[in-house]
Amino acid sequence: MDPCECSKTGTCNCGGSCTCTNCSCTSCKKSCCSCCPAGCSKCASGCVCKGKTCDTSCCQ
């Protein structure tokens, strides 16, 4: 089960090592998603990006 899927509660419990497969949860976008620009194979669905590099520092 994806700890970051929050379709039932609207929130999720994410640890520092959390790996999201479903990034629709707002509270997970900062702490869990590998945020990459379009075209990056590591980009998690639904991530909000502020940079163009393929690393975790590009997450807002």
From Swiss-Prot:
Annotated binding of a divalent metal cation 2, by residue: 6, 12, 14, 25
A GO BP annotation: positive regulation of cell migration involved in sprouting angiogenesis
Keyword Metal-binding in record: yes
Domain notes: Class I metallothioneins contain 2 metal-binding domains: four divalent ions are chelated within cluster A of the alpha domain and are coordinated via cysteinyl thiolate bridges to 11 cysteine ligands. Cluster B, the corresponding region within the beta domain, can ligate three divalent ions to 9 cysteines.
Disulfide bonds: none
Keyword tRNA processing: no
PANTHER family xref list: METALLOTHIONEIN, METALLOTHIONEIN-1X
Key words, A-Z: Metal-binding, Metal-thiolate cluster
Family in the record: Belongs to the metallothionein superfamily. Type 1 family.
Lineage: Eukaryota, Metazoa, Chordata, Craniata, Vertebrata
Residues the record lists as binding a divalent metal cation 4: 32-33, 43, 47
Region spans: Alpha: 29-60
Stretches the record annotates as Beta: 1-28
Positions with a binding annotation for a divalent metal cation 5: 33, 35-36, 49
Gene3D superfamilies: Metallothionein Isoform II
Organism the protein comes from: Sparus aurata
Chain positions recorded as a divalent metal cation 7 binding sites: 49, 54, 58-59
Protein residues bound to a divalent metal cation 3: 14, 18, 23, 28
Protein's name according to its UniProt entry: Metallothionein A
Domain of life of the organism encoding this protein: Eukaryota
Protein residues bound to a divalent metal cation 1: 4, 6, 20, 23
Single GO term (MF): metal ion binding
Main function: Metallothioneins have a high content of cysteine residues that bind various heavy metals.
Binding residues for a divalent metal cation 6: 36, 40, 43, 59
